[in-house]
Amino acid sequence: MARKGSIEMKAKEGAFYAKILLFGEYSIMCDSMALTIPYSHFQGELSFIHEDKYTDQEFAEESSQSLRDFYNYLHNINERGEMFFEFDLNRLKLDIELGMYFESSIPQGFGIGSSGALVAAVYEKYAVNRILPDSSIPSEKLQQLKKIFSKMESFFHGVSSGMDPLNCYIRNPLLIKPDSSIKPVGIPREFSKSGGIFLINTGKPGKTGPLVNLFFEKCKEDEFFNRVKNEMIPFTNQSIEAILKDDFKEFFSKLRSLSGFLLSNLKPMIPEAYHSIWQHGLDTGTYYLKLCGSGGGGFLLGFTEDIKAARQMLKSRDVEIITVS
């Protein structure tokens, strides 16, 4: 259960928030811990084109076509006997024919779970005997949901861990351990009276597939893989452990090391225009940046002990921030 004063989300049934992977991008593929949170600034829900919604007609029609393609994927894996969960595919097909689409403010390709929210919404509405979301849900149920969501979201990414839809569906911070166990956790809303988490919009979407492939190719090099194992993973795990213990002196120490590692070793994942901005945070200690998802564009994730100072410093470099917590 999330403790008092921690990040947790409550939303009406049918509405699904974006998610932010605070820690674990790339390193989770090499068995690090990971920590993910819901982000209520963006959300989406299934709707119908004829309803009075803010989405323009063109977007709604494109979204409806995407849902049609998603239905075909689900239908095909069901026909092949690969769907190990029961769906009301007939009702899904009928609703798509009636003009259903995904009404969403979650930007696509920005690393905050646009497809995850859609998958969670479809599961909630059309799964038969679905597992109900709850912050105290047993670990075995979380694993079962993760497996289901992995199969569903693979339509969008080719391969999916299922973590994005799981976070969108549970609406609670989740800790993923190296043994793949998952549990809801409580994390503080604020690092201090003046600190916080923020996003930077790089202005263009990223492409997950090519960057993930690049990381795997780099991991075939012994020198790079050893750095991942001996530096990136410990910095990630130690950052997570510190934030969960409210030890913010330790947290910012390990976060600085992780941020420096990312800039030195994963530069292709960081838009070139932000290399100097990233380094400036490391040099001054006013803020520290890291990837938000696979990178290459989308959002960057920032942490600071003084949100006002970070905002002013970044604004002087023509960078606006979006506060997360």
Stretch-by-stretch model annotation:
Residues 1-4, 121:
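Detector for intrinsically disordered, low-structure N-terminal pre-sequences
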Residues 117-129:
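Stable alpha-helical structural segments in soluble proteins, enriched in small hydrophobic residues
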Residues 113-115, 292-297:
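Glycine-rich beta-strand-to-loop/alpha-helix junction loops that act as flexible
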Residues 3-23, 27-29, 36-37, 44-96, ...:
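C-terminal nucleotide
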Residues 105-117:
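Gly/Ser-rich catalytic serine loop of serine hydrolases
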